[in-house]
């Protein structure tokens, strides 16, 4: 009987897969000390980021049932 693969919970909270198999994540630097950051910078930080293809392979090992 084969063992089940475990999902890394920290990765599950940080990353999500799109329908096409790309990986989305929330950008950093938008929690505190926001007064010195420009409106344009904060607006761009609200957008989700996409990982590059070689990082996607690593995330898929952390999230086997992703």
Swiss-Prot record:
NCBIfam families associated with the record: rpmI_bact (TIGR00001)
One GO MF term: structural constituent of ribosome
Gene name as annotated: rpmI
A Pfam family reported for this protein in Swiss-Prot or TrEMBL: Ribosomal_L35p
Keywords tagged on the record: Ribonucleoprotein, Ribosomal protein
Cross-referenced PROSITE patterns: RIBOSOMAL_L35 (PS00936)
Keyword Ribonucleoprotein recorded: yes
Species, as recorded: Borreliella burgdorferi (strain ATCC 35210 / DSM 4680 / CIP 102532 / B31)
Gene Ontology biological process: translation
Keyword Membrane: no
Family per similarity comment: Belongs to the bacterial ribosomal protein bL35 family.
Protein name, UniProt field: Large ribosomal subunit protein bL35
